[in-house]
Design a protein with these regions (language model features):
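Extracytoplasmic/secreted proteins, especially bacterial periplasmic and envelope-associated proteins
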Residues: 8-11, 15, 29, 33, ...
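Acidic/histidine-rich catalytic neighborhood of metal-dependent amide-processing enzymes
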Residues: 94-212, 235-238
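A non-catalytic alpha/beta surface segment that caps or lines the substrate-entry region
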Residues: 11-73, 227-229
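N-terminal capping segment at the start of a domain
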Residues: 1-32, 92, 264-272
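Glycine/charged-rich beta-loop-alpha catalytic/anionic-binding loops adjacent to active sites
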Residues: 83-95
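Structural recognition of the beta-strand scaffold that forms the well-ordered cores
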Residues: 65, 85-88, 131-134, 165-170, ...
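Active-site-adjacent substrate-binding region
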Residues: 166, 177-304
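Proline/glycine-enriched tight loop/beta-turn segments at coil->beta junctions
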Residues: 72-84
Length: 304
């Protein structure tokens, strides 16, 4: 792994939020600059990288994908090579916001995971296919519509008949507080801590089995505080990221989040800047997520 992962994560955050700034069509060239940056960072890890273009209202957009093809050791595990894990994050931000937490943290984590996986797997392959995908157009006015990058991606996977056994949406995941009362919840969600010092794994009912497996694997990595919830999709806030696109295609998917507007006071504002991120907690979180996802992928055969 990068010998200074904290510095690497902070570098990504600063580049996204301060060098590029807000990332949407209102800031000309920002989406292309971000896609190019992500592509270059993926390619530095040695992973196979590609852009997946889609057109919406006569404008081209790009999802950027890094691939780790699966190759099980044993013939009895051959089925695993047909199973895919998708780890994704959106790279756009709302107008007027540099989007350090939403969703610079998701993209910074995605880029760090690519570097981690290149080292963890080394000259071997994961048993399951792993795809790291940076999605365009999660924010309004594209959310849940035909211009949403993750929805285009998930639909294409479904058309191809791909067996996606897990999707993780890395969404607004760098703000933590030890202040009492710093954590809020949508109506109907009760019994959870009121101090916002944990990461949340958010699933729908159909993703409960994946949520339990994720809980078990994450607990083995460290004592990092976390909460899990499997809730109906109409629960306010539960569907508000790219995992929703995979739920629509009946794939199991989980949002990994600091809960965004239920905790983060700078959500969707001009004050969503890198200095708001708890870089120590964020670095520890990304490290633990990397080990969790690698365990789910499994160590397979040597590269051919």
């Amino acid at each position: 792994m990068n010998k200074n992962p904290k510095s690497s994560l902070l570098g990504h955050l600063n580049h996204l939020a301060l060098v590029i700034g807000e990332r949407n069509l209102g800031n000309p060239g920002s989406l292309e600059a971000t896609a190019q940056y992500i592509q270059e960072q993926f390619e530095k890890t040695g992973l196979e990288t590609r852009r997946l273009l889609f057109n919406f209202e006569n404008t081209n957009f790009a999802n950027v994908e890094a691939l780790l093809p699966g190759q099980p050791d044993l013939e009895s595990n051959e089925r695993l090579a047909n199973e895919t894990i998708v780890i994704g994050a959106h790279y756009d931000s709302v107008p007027g916001s540099p989007g350090a937490n939403d969703n610079g943290t998701g993209i910074a984590a995605l880029l760090a995971l690519a570097a981690m996986f290149a080292e963890i797997f080394g000259d071997r392959r994961p048993q399951r296919n792993v795809r790291l995908v940076a999605f365009a157009n999660e924010e309004s006015p594209y959310f849940a519509g035909d211009g949403m990058g993750s929805l285009n991606y998930a639909r294409a996977c479904k058309v191809r008949g791909e067996k996606i056994v897990a999707m993780y949406s890395l969404e607004t995941m760098g703000y933590f507080s030890d202040e009492a009362g710093s954590q809020n919840y949508p109506p109907g969600v009760n019994g959870y801590p009121t101090t916002g010092n944990f990461i949340a794994f958010v699933a729908n009912i159909n993703s409960t089995a994946l949520l339990e497996e994720t809980r078990s694997l994450f607990q083995k990595q460290s004592n990092f505080p976390f909460q899990t919830i499997a809730a109906p999709e109409n629960t306010p806030g539960v569907s508000l990221s790219d995992h929703m696109s995979f739920w629509q295609m009946a794939y199991p998917a989980i949002m990994v989040t600091d809960t965004a507007p239920f905790r983060y006071p700078y959500y969707h504002t001009a004050q969503d800047t890198p200095d708001k991120i708890d870089i120590d907690m964020f670095t520890e979180l990304v490290n633990n997520l990397g080990k969790t996802f690698a365990a789910l992928a499994g160590i397979g055969a040597k590269r051919l």
